[in-house]
């Protein structure tokens, strides 16, 4: 039993290190946002291609026991939480919560985003006009 406790203690130490590293990452991201705001009038700096390149680099170099798909989800949530340090993304989507649109928005933008449901296509576009959301997720046929 002592061996299991030793392993758990090591996991706890790693968890503590992960929290410190995630917080350090957040601090650096805030600094990047401050630098970007000096150069741009934009108040939001979501850069999807940067996120894609990070996910590609991390999954390519992993070599560990976690499947790449799991790493993608972990990093999606880190990106979402990091963006929320500035201001959460506001994602408009068609339908109530738990619909396919809502689930797709969570998968793409993470749980730290703010999700704004709309009952019809007209109201979802009105959200953009009123600046109530920064991104729309609509079904394209």
Regions found by a protein language model. Name each.
Residues 1-141:
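Domain-level signature for soluble enzymes in the chorismate/prephenate branch of the shikimate pathway
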């Amino acid at each position: 039993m002592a061996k299991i406790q030793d392993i758990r203690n090591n996991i706890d130490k790693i968890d503590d290190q992960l929290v410190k590293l995630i917080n350090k990452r957040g601090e650096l991201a805030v600094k990047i946002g401050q630098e970007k705001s000096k150069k741009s009038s934009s108040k939001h700096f979501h850069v999807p291609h940067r996120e894609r390149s990070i996910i590609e680099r991390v999954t390519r170099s992993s070599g560990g026991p976690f499947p790449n798909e799991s790493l993608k989800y972990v990093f999606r949530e880190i990106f979402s939480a990091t963006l929320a340090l500035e201001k959460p993304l506001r994602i408009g989507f068609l339908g109530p919560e738990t619909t396919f649109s809502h689930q797709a928005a969570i998968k793409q933008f993470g749980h730290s985003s703010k999700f704004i449901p709309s009952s019809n296509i007209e109201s979802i576009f009105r959200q953009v006009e009123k600046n109530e959301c920064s991104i729309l997720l609509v079904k394209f046929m």
